Design a protein with these regions (language model features):
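Short beta-strand/loop motif that positions the catalytic acidic residue
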Residues: 243, 249-251, 255
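Short alpha-helix in the alpha/beta-hydrolase fold that links the catalytic acid
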Residues: 245, 259-268
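Flexible "cap/lid" loop of the alpha/beta hydrolase fold
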Residues: 145-146, 151-182
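Conserved alpha/beta-hydrolase catalytic His-Asp/Glu region
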Residues: 165-167, 185-241
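Alpha/beta-hydrolase fold catalytic core
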Residues: 1-62, 85-86, 302-315
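Conserved HGGG/HGGXW glycine-rich cap/lid loop of the alpha/beta-hydrolase fold
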Residues: 45, 49-98
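Active-site loop/oxyanion-hole signature of alpha/beta-hydrolase fold enzymes
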Residues: 90-131, 295
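Catalytic active-site module of serine/aspartate enzymes centered on a nucleophile-bearing elbow/loop
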Residues: 273-315
Length: 315
């Protein structure tokens, strides 16, 4: 005889309230439009280029150092939510605007770090949280090493200390620095992006996939090749043990661009690092998991008060 407890719900189960429905994913284009409407746009006439930056929100300063490609609009959904708790700042790299005066051949990776400190001084920021993504993590780590007292905590996602490039790839980078236009005209761009990231955008996020392709295609080729060339010559391993700042390492467990070994190398070398492996996440959580990414960043940088977390449901 079948066990009736397996086929008939108990009174307690029948009376239990239904699980709340997950909210629909945010509309990325609407989020970007809102960010454009609300963010303050400024320009800093730095020693190497006229830097365009955007500021949104009130609270402790948080500087987001972006990845190697795409535009600030790809981070808009994350920034909109972080702006509820932080004064967020994001900026454009040299060469992103044709009139910014950047002479890319003269700009080193250390210069990019200098520019972060120049922007901080320009905005009269004392101490700030740093959040670096992908290529931006290399600038973040160097900044933490150079002046750790200015940064109480930092978060890096898709981080690495070094990347290997083949001779053919290095040659392609040199040629790329001479090409006009944006990455939208590069052959095989969509096929490569699809291989690396498409499976991390389920059907419910189809609009975000198209937006990602669009924004990625707006990246100018020459400055992108310049940044890739900087990465090809970079090795941060010697400075990692001397970084005393608390660092949270976020790594997608399905990241096809930055392999897990890079995360493990950083976790072993940084004295005060914590690591989080994000399930079912690739290299673009600011697109695929923007809302959750913002919550993780906010809750780790500003831990809960003794009376409870702001995101916890009330009993």
């Amino acid at each position: 005889m079948p066990d009736p407890t397996l086929s008939e719900p108990s009174a307690a189960t029948a009376d239990a309230p239904p699980f709340p429905r997950c909210p629909d994913p945010a509309d990325f284009r609407a989020e970007a439009a809102s960010y454009d409407r609300l963010a303050e746009v400024g320009t800093w006439a730095g020693p190497r280029y006229r830097m365009t930056y955007r500021v949104l929100g009130q609270g402790p300063p948080l500087i987001l150092i972006p990845g190697i490609a795409s535009t600030y609009r790809g981070y808009a959904t994350t920034l909109n939510r972080l702006a509820e708790r932080f004064r967020t700042v994001i900026y454009d790299y040299p060469g992103e605007h044709p009139d910014d005066g950047a002479r890319l051949r003269r700009i080193s990776h250390d210069d990019l770090v200098d520019d972060v400190f120049g922007l901080i001084d320009h905005l009269n920021i004392g101490r700030a949280f740093l959040v670096g993504l992908s290529f931006g993590t290399t600038i973040t780590l160097k900044a933490l090493h150079r002046e750790p007292r200015r940064f109480p905590k930092a978060i890096v996602q898709g981080a690495f200390a070094r990347r290997g490039f083949t001779t053919a790839e290095k040659l392609a980078l040199r040629l790329g620095r001479l090409m006009p236009g944006t990455t939208a005209r590069l052959p095989l761009r969509r096929a490569i992006l699809t291989y690396n990231s498409k499976n991390h955008f389920p059907a419910i996020l189809e609009d975000r996939w198209h937006y990602y392709l669009e924004q990625n295609g707006l990246t100018p080729i020459a400055p992108l090749a310049h940044r890739l060339d900087l990465v090809a010559r970079l090795d941060l391993r010697p400075i990692l043990p001397a970084i005393p700042v608390e660092v949270l390492l976020l790594q997608g467990n399905e990241d096809r661009i930055i392999a897990r070994r890079h995360h493990d190398e950083l976790l072993a070398a940084l004295p005060r690092a914590e690591g989080v492996i994000m399930p079912l996440v690739g290299h673009q959580p600011h697109f695929t998991h923007a809302e959750a990414l913002a919550q993780v960043i906010g809750d780790w940088l500003l831990p809960c008060a003794p009376e409870g977390c702001p995101n916890e449901p009330k009993a």
